[in-house]
């Protein structure tokens, strides 16, 4: 019995030592080498950066620092097992500076490598040009095209008695051919505004239009229930 107990304790001690060795990370203050050979591929609303990783044994990841809007900083990281970073969220096609830094397991950062990206037209802009809003029974119906299946919100606003637009509905979608309806309205003419917004807060140009919803009347089921069928 004592031999079995000693054996079990020995095994547990070996496991504990192994776990300690596995989780122990040597720390230092030596910064890793920077990435090199950076290639930029501009995409709608962003860019893909391909690079050569440094040879540092304790490399942890690569980080990209950039500004989405004036004064709004953002970052994205990629592990040491890949050699590309995808940057998204730009609302315009203006040139931007992106800084790439390598980070090691001691969280030391390399000197930054600066590259220039020039995003293609943002999805919100492209989708916004396809927006349509038409009269529907008891409301309005919106249509839009989203070929890239971007995550978007379609925001519908209506003008109130103070001539101010207020949000009355929002449709969340990633489908290619999107459509949605807002109902519960009378037939009086109404001023609407509709636009696209993405998860970074970028918005398309708004479509403003005046629409009179179609008359809608709830069907009286008692008419059918009260009807008799020949032969009954």
Please identify what each model-predicted range represents:
Residues 18-58, 92, 105-150, 201-231:
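Pro/Thr/Ser/Gly-rich low-complexity, intrinsically disordered linker/stalk tracts
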Residues 46-73, 140-169:
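Solvent-exposed loop/turn segments flanking beta-strands in beta-repeat/beta-sandwich domains
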Residues 7, 33-45, 65-79:
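Long alpha-helical, hydrophobic tracts
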Residues 60, 85-115, 176-214:
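Beta-strand-rich modules
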Residues 78-85, 124:
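Blade-loop segments of beta-propeller domains
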Residues 13-16:
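C-terminal motif of bacterial Sec signal peptides marking the signal peptidase cleavage site
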Residues 2-10:
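Sec-dependent signal peptide recognition
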Residues 74-81, 168-176:
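Short beta-strand segments within Ig-like beta-sandwich modules, predominantly Fibronectin type-III
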């Amino acid at each position: 019995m004592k031999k079995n107990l000693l054996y079990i304790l020995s095994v547990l001690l070996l496991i504990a030592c192994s776990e300690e060795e596995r989780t122990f990370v040597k720390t230092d203050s030596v910064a890793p080498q920077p990435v090199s050979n950076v290639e930029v591929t501009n995409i709608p609303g962003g860019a893909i950066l391909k690079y050569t990783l440094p040879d540092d044994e304790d490399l942890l990841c690569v980080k990209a620092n950039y500004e989405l809007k004036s004064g709004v900083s953002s970052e994205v990281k990629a592990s040491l097992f890949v050699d590309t970073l995808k940057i998204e969220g730009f609302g315009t096609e203006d040139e931007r500076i992106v800084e790439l830094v390598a980070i090691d397991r001691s969280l030391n950062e390399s000197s930054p490598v600066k590259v220039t990206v020039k995003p293609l037209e943002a999805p919100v802009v492209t989708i916004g040009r396809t927006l349509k809003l038409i009269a529907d029974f008891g409301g309005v119906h919106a249509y839009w095209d989203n070929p890239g299946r971007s995550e978007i919100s379609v925001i519908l606003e209506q003008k109130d008695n103070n001539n101010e637009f207020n949000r009355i509905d929002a449709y969340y979608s990633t489908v290619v051919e999107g459509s949605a309806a807002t109902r519960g309205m009378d037939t009086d003419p109404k001023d609407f505004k509709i636009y696209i917004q993405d998860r970074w807060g970028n918005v398309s140009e708004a479509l403003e239009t005046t629409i009179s919803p179609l008359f809608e009347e709830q069907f009286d089921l008692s008419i059918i229930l009260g009807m008799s069928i020949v032969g009954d």
